[in-house]
Amino acid sequence: MQNVEKNRKPFAWAMLVVILWFVITGIFGPLFGKLTSVQENNNSSFLPKGAEATLAADQIKLFSSQDSFNFPALVLFEGSSTPATFAAINERVLQVGNLTLAGTSAKISEFLAPGSGISVFPSQDGEALLANIPLDGNAISKLLPNDEPVLPAVVEALREDLEPIAKANGFEPYVTGPAGLLGDLFGAFGDIDSKLLLTTLGVVAIILIVVYRSPILWIIPLLSALFALSTAGGIVYLLAKNDIIDVDGQSQGILSVLVIGAATDYALLLIARYREELHFTDNRFVAMRAAYKGVWEPILASGSTVAISLLVLLFSQLTNTAGLGPIGAIGIVVSMFTILTLLPALLLIFGRWIFWPRVPKNDGDDHVMSGSWSKISNSIAGNPRKAWIITGVVLLAFASASTTLKADGIGTVDTFTGKPESVVGQRLLEKHFPGGQGNPTQIVVAADKIGAVTAAVKNAPGVTEVVPMLDGMTPAGGPAPEVKIVNGRAILNLTLDKAPDSVEAGNDIPKIRELAHAADSTSLVGGTSAVYFDVRTANNRDNRTIIPIILLAITLILGVLLRSILSAVVLLGTVVLSYFATLGVCALVFNHVFGFAGGENSFPLFAFIFLVALGIDYNIFLMTRVREESAKIGTRAGVTKGVTVTGAVITSAGIVLAATFAVLGLLPLVPLAQLGFAVAFGVLLDTIIVRSILVPALVHEIGPKIWRPSKLQTK
């Protein structure tokens, strides 16, 4: 009777915690469903205010009567052109403003750029027509009354309307250009809410069922992870809605897999320790208290390491990269809080039977001290030097291939793993027209320097045409309007011979800027190619500055947690080695298996954050247990027991996290597929090789000195 009274209070607290979590999720869950509506996927919006492309864009807006900028939708009609077919296509294209967007009463005319006309012109080879439909960049970035983004709806309406007239006149139509490519990008990210999330949950559920061999237990950690994701997603939505952070499709996808993976990892650690403690008591509340005491510190340290590493991204010059920092940190903090509150409450409410059919009994038997992990840890203890030398050499061999990794940026057409209509259209456009046709690089110049700048840049690499912006459209058979002058400034439109969003076009920008600045020191070079070049420059700067800051932060956290400088340096060194080994494998696979054209400049940074921060996670889980056991039985015996008792749960956690990130490969986008592969492979490498063999072998080799300067160095 006394035990019943004693247990009633913690049971009531557990019920209260669960009720509170249902209230929290009820508030934030519906907001998570709206997260896609606040996405921003336009590269130009991510640049810092001081970037030249941004400064140019600000001045280019002054040349419009409204606060807008042109965002062209290019429609390529491939086929033999005759006066009759040209007239038919031209007539139809000029009427697209009357098209109504699906599911709304809005017309395309509401989203056309003011002061710019729709135009159609033939290619020099007579085998294609190109329609330029200038959209209002600000208007298409908003939402329709049905809360759907404008741009994909406009692109879809153009495709549906122009296909019949094109085919009737012997043409194959392709909606491409910036609007078509970004519209297809929206479509790819649109799968995040459904396909990515459901697949991630399904994969994690299967792994948990295999790990626990229980038809019931797997539901509890997965439910906790869902509560964490809904809450984190709702918080992120509110921040993005109020323009505090930027959310793009990539950061939303990463948030989903990061929260589910991290929350499940923390849950595996807590449940494993809880099951272990249930073998030593009949009272589940006593067992949970002991388990909680053993895991709260490593979970808090692990989550804090990842969260702080992500927050370092706030130092990025790009707002989308900087936005990923707090987005990921919110996900990790909410995951920790959920697993340290909701999960214990659920486990206590359901009792021991939740482990059925393998219900732990109070038999005083330390079951985890037998089995394959006991054999592995004892084998390493028998010859640690051989173990760390062999694993070190293998990792160094993989790391040597990291120098062949291609991560110097990719164009939008190479961003897709498949071939959507916009990509096919852009490739064909480059066959019949200059690659930059319809989407020029723009130079803002002083009005009295138009001739000088034109002469300076007309023979620059990649430039096929230089024309000033005119004050209005040229009437049929009439004289051309005057050059448009605003506040003593004019705009030169440069047509490049390459796709404007390609790496090659971006490579032409520095020379164009050098020549333009020499002719007019006040000139500003902007446009799509300049934006991509400035984004690439900012990414390279981030790689050089943010990675060292993260390394310093992680070293300090490890030093405080383990009370040892040497152990912090050793652990960090092993994870960095694992990171470069992973990059080496990525280089081999991306170049020779998947055949990717390249990778984003941000790939090394994102891979570093997730691989190093998450890799340190598993070392924290291991070494906090090793430290706990070393205080009781000595360092070498402690590391043997630590590997034995944590081996299964940490490996399971690694498999879960690897599987969740691997799901990113389902999205038809190269950057996410690359990041998913890198994190999945890197996490498995870290859990199976680094944490299981290399770290224990090094600790055995170094001995008690690993704990310097703490008192444990004598154990």
Locate each region found by the language model.
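Short coil/turn segments at secondary-structure boundaries
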Residues: 73-74, 390-393, 441
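Structured non-transmembrane domains adjacent to transmembrane bundles in polytopic membrane proteins
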Residues: 49-70, 80-179, 407-598, 620
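Membrane-embedded transmembrane helical bundles of large multi-pass transporters/channels
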Residues: 1-40, 126, 136-138, 142-407, ...
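N-terminal entry motif of extracellular EGF-like repeats
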Residues: 43
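Short loop/turn and capping residues at structural boundaries
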Residues: 71, 250, 391, 468-469
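Short, conserved active-site loops that position catalytic residues or coordinate cofactors/metal ions
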Residues: 36-37, 71-72, 77
